Swiss-Prot record:
Stretch list, region Required for interaction with NRIP1: 584-603
Covalent cross-link site, Glycyl lysine isopeptide (Lys-Gly) (interchain with G-Cter in SUMO2): K250, K588
Organism for this UniProt entry: Macaca fascicularis
Localization of this protein: Nucleus; Nucleus, PML body
Region described as Required for interaction with KAT2B: spans on this chain: 1-178
Primary location group: nucleus
Chain's gene name: NR2C1
Residues bearing PTM Phosphothreonine: T220, T222
The protein, known as: Nuclear receptor subfamily 2 group C member 1
Keyword set, alphabetical order: Activator, DNA-binding, Isopeptide bond, Metal-binding, Nucleus, Phosphoprotein, Receptor, Repressor, Transcription, Transcription regulation, Ubl conjugation, Zinc, Zinc-finger
SMART domains with a match to the protein in the record: HOLI, ZnF_C4
CC per GO annotation: PML body
Length: 603
């Protein structure tokens, strides 16, 4: 007797059909032994895919028309059943109904969708499909959507379950002959904006991440590309992590929030971008009355030809303060109040060090860090959208960056170094502070999902030849370093005091070239280390090597490339503007003005 595989191949060769999911129960079935090979109407038994008890007897008879088979369950009644091979390799499928109604006549044929079994509306893109699968295939190809299957890539696709797995549905469309090159490019509006913001990268590629609150690792990233848009020429060839346009539409697989809805439920999700844009616009407005050379300097701001530090000299303190109105949303007002009071309470403990190195630093007794420096509460954009986009990720990252700078400003010893030294330290070590913040806010930011999405998008770009292997390797190494570092920190169960002292040790690093008062900075670092050691000795007396384990994690921070961090987390908000160009504006604000804005503009 022939095997199941041989019978399946015979049926396919005779164009008699193929076995697929049964529509009523959604249960997958496979062809088994033909009971009688001599009868004109061939008889089959359909069983479950695991070979369990036979479920139904099917009588199949060949009609005079080649390639058509009429099926009657249990030799009576009217029913519809269609077939496919288990590996979805079939090139043809014909579904027919044996209808005995006297009004319609015998053997009336109904064309059903080869993908899901719904009533077909015609041949679309090379295959007989329904309107639903036609639209799904068109959207997927036009927008170059990439789906992922949460199962074993063999999900049931029928009329009732076709929306559960977009990956398997798209693969099924392609397997049954729907041609990708038959989908025409989407028509563009006649009127196209001739100018694009110089502060944002020119790209409309987006990442949409399906949120799963139960598991941060089960994300379904969707990668959207507009090939007709001018692309950024930054580190990522195709600007794949950039999202410029917040507007969108609702589809079966992804909810793209419209701009007005996003504003109403999330507030201003462009904190960092608003700061950069506001500063640039302020400079352009004030410079209208100045000569053309100064105007050229301002116009080159967004191209990173001129440092934002130079641009700062043209602004008054009031103008800069107003430009940072949106920055206040990034921070917790309660925490800012505590930090402000702590700074005020410690006035007089240190004397500010000016550029004149002849002034000696004097210090009163007291710790480098107080209890107010332990709290590090990141306020995420609220509420979280059902599907996170890269703009939301960038806004979350910018809030973490601002919170880290605000934390540094709240340390009296840091302020005592003077403005130039403070700016130099933060510009040198913002990436290390940001990475420590990622580890500390691992769960709040859902960092695991963000990193997994970056990896999936890099893999997709390589498959589509959008990125060289060397470039992909560079980015993947950085992402894996981030993941390894954050995972190691999470496993150590580091508390708030330990994170605060680790950040202080990183912040007061005297080995950056160009720093003044290096001996004083080194003294602050030594004090942070001594206090850190005392805290661990008192808090974890039984963990002899805890201090060593924590300090040994710091060298890994130096391996993180700040340029790649900017590409991944911030380019979608500020384009090619460098983070170290924005830092001076934040640190040059007066603490009182900074904190008052936080209190007055909290979310």
């Amino acid at each position: 007797m022939a095997t199941i595989e041989e019978i399946a191949h015979q049926i396919i060769e005779q164009q008699m059909g193929e076995i697929v999911t049964e529509q009523q129960t959604g249960q997958k079935i496979q062809i088994v032994t033909a009971l009688d090979h001599n009868t004109q109407g061939k008889q089959f038994i359909l069983t479950n895919h695991d070979g369990s008890t036979p479920s139904k007897v099917i009588l199949a008879r060949q009609d005079s028309t080649p390639g058509k088979v009429f099926l009657t369950p249990d030799a009576a009644g009217v029913n519809q059943l269609f077939f496919t091979t288990p590996d979805l390799s079939a090139q043809h499928l014909q579904l027919l109904t044996d209808n005995s109604s006297p009004d319609q006549g015998p053997n009336k044929v109904f064309d059903l969708c080869v993908v899901c079994g719904d009533k077909a509306s015609g041949r679309h893109y090379g295959a007989v499909t329904c309107e639903g699968c036609k639209g799904f295939f068109k959207r997927s190809i036009r927008k170059n959507l990439v789906y992922s299957c949460r199962g074993s890539k063999d999900c049931i696709i029928n009329k009732h379950h076709r929306n559960r797995c977009q990956y398997c549905r798209l693969q099924r469309c392609i397997a049954f002959g729907m041609k990708q090159d038959s989908v025409q490019c989407e028509r563009k509006p006649i009127e196209v904006s001739r100018e694009k913001s110089s502060n944002c990268a020119a790209s409309t590629e987006k990442i949409y991440i399906r949120k799963d609150l139960r598991s941060p690792l089960t994300a379904t990233p969707t990668f959207v590309t507009d090939s007709e848009t001018t692309r950024s020429t930054g580190l990522l060839d195709s600007g794949m992590f950039v999202n410029i346009h917040p507007s969108g539409v609702k589809t079966e697989s992804t909810v793209l929030m419209t701009s007005d809805k996003a504003e109403s439920c999330q507030g201003d999700l462009s904190t960092l971008a608003s700061v950069v844009t506001s500063l640039a616009n302020l400079g352009k407005t004030k410079d209208l009355s100045q000569n053309s050379n100064e105007m050229s300097m301002i116009e080159s701001l967004s191209n990173d030809d001129t440092s934002l530090c130079e641009f700062q000299e043209m602004q008054t303190n009031g103008d800069v303060s107003r430009a940072f109105d949106t920055l206040a949303k990034a921070l917790n007002p309660g925490e800012s109040t505590a930090c402000q009071s702590s700074v005020a309470g410690m006035e007089g403990s240190v004397h500010l060090i000016t550029g004149d190195s002849s002034i000696n630093y004097t210090e009163k007794e007291g710790p480098l860090l107080s209890d107010s420096h332990v709290a590090f509460r990141l306020t995420m954009p609220s509420p979280m959208p059902e599907y996170l986009n890269v703009h939301y990720i960038g806004e979350s990252a910018s809030r973490l960056l601002f919170l880290s700078m605000h934390w540094a400003l709240s340390i009296p010893s840091f302020q005592a170094l003077g403005q130039e030294n403070s700016i130099s330290l933060v510009k040198a070590y913002w990436n290390e502070l940001f990475t420590l913040g990622l580890a500390q806010c691992w769960q709040v930011m859902n960092v695991a999902t963000i990193l997994a999405t970056f990896v999936n998008c890099l893999h997709n770009s390589l498959q589509q030849d959008k990125m060289s292997t060397e470039r992909r390797k560079l980015l993947m190494e950085h992402i894996f370093k981030l993941q390894e570092f954050c995972n190691s920190m999470v496993k150590l169960c580091i508390d708030g005091y330990e994170y605060a002292y680790l950040k202080a040790i990183v912040l007061f690093s005297p080995d950056h070239p160009g720093l003044e008062n290096m001996e004083q900075i080194e003294k602050f670092q030594e004090k942070a280390y001594v206090e850190f050691q005392d805290y661990i000795t008192k808090t974890y007396p039984d963990d002899t090597y805890r201090l060593s384990r924590l300090l040994l994690r710091l060298p890994a921070l130096r391996l993180m490339n700040a340029t790649i961090t900017e590409e991944l987390f911030f380019k979608g908000l500020i384009g090619n503007i460098r983070i170290d160009s924005v830092i001076p504006h934040i640190l040059k604000m007066e603490p009182a003005d900074y904190n008052s804005q936080i209190i007055g503009h909290s979310i």
